[in-house]
Regions:
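Short alpha-helical donor nucleotide-sugar binding micro-motif in glycosyltransferases
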Residues: 222-227
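Donor nucleotide-sugar binding/catalytic pocket of nucleotide-sugar-dependent glycosyltransferases
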Residues: 105-141
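Aromatic "clamp/platform" in nucleotide-sugar-dependent glycosyltransferases that forms part
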Residues: 235
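Conserved acidic donor-binding segment of nucleotide-sugar-dependent glycosyltransferases
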Residues: 266-278, 286-291
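Nucleotide-activated donor-binding/catalytic signature segment of Leloir-type glycosyltransferases, i.e.
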Residues: 197-215
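A charged, aromatic-enriched C-terminal amphipathic alpha-helix characteristic of glycosyltransferases
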Residues: 289-321
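Short hydrophobic beta-strand element within catalytic cores of glycosyltransferases
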Residues: 252-255
Length: 321
């Protein structure tokens, strides 16, 4: 099968990872995969086995299936000659839906169960099951690494996107200092042409907190593996990559429902809290003070991540294409 995928860039974003990982899986299964984006350069942060070409090349090519997930490349995606056009919704409030919904020549897909159901109600037509996404062979526990670090809380540091809830989490953590066992906070983010805001500028950091800027894939994995707790307070997310990566790596996860409903089960493999300081504080306090709870949540995480692997998702999408 000839599969064409469209992205606005290949920077360090969860939506970009989705297309790179799926492309790798489809190539491994013998399919011909081409990624179109404006600059046409290969991603530098994650190996990619498909073909990468400039967006303008799509006009002279054909495919069996074309997949797009953003409004910026939508026009080129629709003009591209393909047997089927699929718009893959990966975030709530996706601006691309303004064009995709009334376009009945486009098949819709979504990356979470909640988003899929919401989109089906709004569109009045079927939505492909594009739910899932994790590389469990990479994101996996390494108990020895965690045992060698002090009590550590890991947080997605992307403050340029308020919906990630980074500052909310930092304020909650600051309020817990001195009221729970001593802990350190580590935040991660990248700063590049696609995410220019330095998250360290004006960050309301609690004591003993630090940023790791631009971690490699291996360094990011090590951060998950060495952290005891991961906190995500997102809103309007499609699929919370970081929460699932933490879960798969054996962290005790505290999260909101946004982007986690498919895999986070309250009191089983995570503590799921309302996105409010009171409820987040209560949940984080529990995992920081109760070592047995931390261990129980951490132990349940890796197995619960397995059904959502990229290989499973790639096969599922191929069956629907």
């Amino acid at each position: 099968m000839r599969i064409a995928t469209f992205l606005p860039h290949v920077g360090v974003f969860g939506g970009v990872r989705r297309f790179l990982e799926l492309g790798n899986e489809w190539v491994a299964r013998g399919h011909d995969v081409t990624l179109y984006h404006p600059e046409g350069n290969a991603p530098a942060w994650l190996p990619y086995r498909g073909r990468v070409v400039p967006l303008t090349a799509a006009a002279d090519a054909e495919s069996d299936v074309a997949v797009c997930a953003d409004p910026h490349t939508y026009g080129t995606f629709r003009a591209h000659r393909s047997g089927r056009h699929v718009y893959y919704c990966v975030i709530e409030g996706d601006a691309g839906l303004d064009r995709a919904l009334p376009d009945h020549g486009v098949t819709l897909a979504a990356n979470s169960g909640a988003l899929r159901a919401k989109l089906a109600r709004r569109a009045g037509r079927p939505v492909l099951d594009g739910v899932g996404g994790i590389r469990t062979s990479v994101f996996r526990p390494l108990p020895a690494l965690r045992a060698g670090t002090p009590l550590r809380v890991l947080v997605n540091g992307r403050r340029s996107r308020p919906k990630k809830g980074t500052d909310l989490v930092l304020r909650v953590l600051a309020g817990l200092v001195g009221k729970v066992p001593e802990f350190e906070v580590v935040l991660f983010d990248s700063v590049d042409v696609h995410n220019r805001q330095d998250p360290r500028d004006g960050a309301p950091l609690p004591p003993n907190a630090r940023f790791v800027i631009g971690p490699t894939q291996e360094e990011l994995v090590a951060l998950y593996q060495s952290s005891h707790v991961f906190v995500a307070a997102e809103r309007k997310a499609g699929w919370c990559n970081t929460a699932l990566e933490a879960l798969a790596s054996g962290c005790a996860v505290v999260c909101t429902r946004s982007g986690t409903r498919d895999f986070a089960v309250h009191e089983h493999n995570a503590l799921v809290a309302w996105r409010h300081p009171f409820f987040l504080r209560r949940a984080i306090r529990r995992v920081l003070t109760d070592g047995a709870l931390r261990e129980r949540l951490a132990a349940a995480g890796p197995a619960s991540a397995e059904p959502w692997g990229w290989p499973v998702l790639a096969e599922k999408l191929l069956r629907q294409f």
